[in-house]
Curated annotation (Swiss-Prot):
It comes from Xenopus laevis (African clawed frog). GO terms for cellular component: cytosol; growth cone. PANTHER family: DIHYDROPYRIMIDINASE-RELATED PROTEIN 3 (PTHR11647:SF57), HYDRANTOINASE/DIHYDROPYRIMIDINASE FAMILY MEMBER (PTHR11647). It holds the Pfam family Amidohydro_1. Keywords: Cell projection, Cytoplasm. Belongs to the metallo-dependent hydrolases superfamily. Hydantoinase/dihydropyrimidinase family. One of its GO terms (biological process) is actin crosslink formation. This is Dihydropyrimidinase-related protein 3-A. The keyword Nucleus does not apply. The keyword Cytoplasm applies. It is found in: Cytoplasm; Cell projection, Growth cone. One of its GO terms (molecular function) is hydrolase activity, acting on carbon-nitrogen (but not peptide) bonds, in cyclic amides.
Length: 571
């Protein structure tokens, strides 16, 4: 059977499933109940459910049943300098499902000056034929013009896209000026879309890269040395400032440093509508590996912004994720082979950027945050699924276990322990940046669209069964505050009369001359004129010799607060 009229794309056959004896964990509550699913939807939740015959029953045995994970940042089948990442939409979504993720949001990256709409359709074609789980798409704005503006509007209103990423780095390629950021944020806010930013100071990075190469530093360590965390933090602050001025919600992707986390946290405490997205790599490892003697290993960690060389950073980011200062997690999964990375063996600026993390994301967060007592199981659901669904207007279809929601579920075993290895992971990448790491917490059963996709470590997937999920504009979770602030922030001029006093004539001022009464040296304080009280014209009676008229000693001026409308006259 075809899917939505598309040829050669199979439609998934949903099973009638009953999960018994599980502990349902949503972002706001946990409780024991059974779940019945049919036609890809959750039909019943409760005890002693009455279900039709022929139902497949899964015994959860008291294990947690959580909403399927949503990975909000992936780069599958991404073109790069004539190459493509080794994980396409088939291999990448297989790895996602193996880790407990049932939906991804991938990034469309148009070439500079290329059509955003055409790039979007190209990504749709690639994904529709290969994905094994549901997906949506962000679209990156790689240049800005009136025609791009029209395309953005079309994508929002007709194509199901509600988020767009702009770059503050990659000078002379994707980097936007402050003026362009202001215009883009203003326009996205009017459409009800979400502005995402890759936050780094591209101008300074370009200078620092040249400096490193001049110093003879050509290896992967040059990548992090040319991109200190201050350059990420500066761009984060600038993006927050511009977004605030335009009253546009801001989503900071790939939060990698303590400084950036702190800025996002402070902005949220001040009431700014800003969201921060740490990724699997920044939550699970650090940038000390850039100095590895093994070039291939060091290159595997190259991504931008870079991982912090401060080894205490992952724990710090996990703490702020647990406290709510950061809200959502992605993987930024973009995998290249060692041979592909090696095109930059003599110049670190040419190393393709990207790390793995789509399969490890949920286990890394459980191990680093839940198993350590930083967050509870409900917060875990929030940062791996629910908050993402709310931000991108997918909730409660996604991100919640409730009647009517999609039957994307995971039976999660908090006691499972696995050792990460490139030999056993489902990615096509030959190196795993979490190699040898022992992680607590793993999925036992993964259900997507009401079908068992993974059970007992074995995948049961069908290529091309993933659906494109439309993301509507103006998500309440994001825009309720924006709308209220728009009403409160209406600006009005001060009502006043026309100024009818003298106006200085600039045309009469010599162009190259020095203004009268001043010198070309340092400015000096002018001494104000002082009336000589011994001058013969001075009188205590109130009538002065240098005044043309007689004034009353106690005349009172009556005027409304702020003065009369004619500001050149007091009478």
């Amino acid at each position: 059977m075809s899917y939505q009229g598309k040829k050669n794309i199979p439609r998934i056959t949903s099973e009638r499933l009953l999960i018994k004896g599980g502990r349902i964990v949503n972002d706001d509550q946990s409780f024991y109940a059974d779940i019945y699913m049919e036609d890809g939807l959750i039909k019943q939740i409760g005890d002693n459910l009455i279900v039709p015959g022929g139902v497949k029953t899964i015994e959860a045995n008291g294990k947690m049943v959580i909403p399927g994970g949503i990975d909000v940042h992936t780069h599958l089948q991404m073109p790069y300098r004539g190459m493509t990442t080794v994980d396409d939409f088939l291999q990448g979504t297989k790895a996602a499902l193996a880790g407990g993720t049932t939906m991804i949001v991938d990034h469309v990256i148009p070439e500079p000056e290329a059509s955003l709409t055409e790039a979007f359709e190209k990504w749709r074609e690639w994904a529709d034929g290969k994905t094994c789980c549901d997906y949506s798409l962000h679209v990156d704005i790689t240049h800005w013009s009136d025609s791009v503006k029209q395309e953005v509007e079309t994508l929002v209103k007709q194509k199901g896209v509600n988020s767009f990423m702009v770059y503050m780095a990659y000078k002379d390629l994707y980097q936007m000026s402050n003026t362009e950021l202001y215009e883009i944020f203003t326009f996205l806010g009017s459409l009800g879309a979400i502005a995402q930013v890759h936050a780094e100071n591209g101008d300074i990075i370009a200078q620092e890269q040249n400096r490193m190469l001049e110093l003879g530093i050509t290896g992967p360590e040059g990548h992090v040395l040319s991109r200190p965390e201050e350059l990420e933090a500066e761009a984060v602050f600038r993006a927050i400032t511009i977004a605030s001025q335009t009253n546009c919600p801001l989503y900071v992707t790939k939060v990698m440093s303590k400084s950036s986390v702190d800025l996002i946290s402070q902005a949220r405490k001040k009431g700014y509508v800003v969201f921060g997205e740490p990724i699997t790599a920044s939550l699970g490892t650090d940038g000390t590996h850039y100095w590895s003697k093994n070039w291939a290993k060091a290159a595997a960690f190259v991504t931008s912004p870079p991982l912090s060389p401060d080894p205490t950073t992952p724990d710090y980011i996990n703490s702020l994720l647990a406290s709510g200062d950061l809200q959502v997690t992605g993987s930024a999964h973009a995998t290249f082979s060692t041979a592909q990375k090696a095109i930059g063996k003599d110049n670190f600026t040419l190393i393709p950027e990207g790390t793995n993390g789509i399969e490890e994301r949920m286990s890394v967060i459980w191990d680093k945050s839940v198993a350590t007592g930083k967050m509870d199981e409900n917060q875990f659901v929030s940062v791996t699924s629910t908050n993402a669904a709310k931000i991108f207007n997918l909730y409660p279809r996604k991100g919640r276990i409730a009647v009517g929601s999609d039957s994307d579920l995971v039976i999660w075993d908090p006691d499972a322990v696995k050792i990460v290895s490139a030999k056993s992971h489902h990615s096509a990448a030959e190196y795993n940046i979490f190699e040898g790491m022992e992680l607590r917490g793993a999925p036992l059963v993964v259900i997507c669209q009401g079908k068992i996709m993974m059970e007992d470590g074995t995948l049961h997937v069908t290529q091309g069964t993933g659906r494109f999920i439309h993301c509507s504009p103006f998500p309440d979770y994001v825009y309720k505050r924006i709308k209220a602030r728009t009403k409160m922030a209406e600006l009005h001029g001060v009502p006043r009369g026309m100024y009818d006093g003298p106006v200085y004539d600039l045309a009469s001022t010599p162009k190259a001359g020095t203004p009268a009464g001043s010198t070309k040296g340092s400015p000096t304080k002018q001494t104000p004129p002082v009336r000589n009280l011994h001058h013969s014209a001075f009188s205590l009676a109130g009538n002065q010799g240098d005044e043309s008229g007689v004034r009353s000693a106690s005349r009172r001026i009556v005027a409304p607060p702020g003065g009369r409308s004619n500001i050149t006259s007091l009478s």
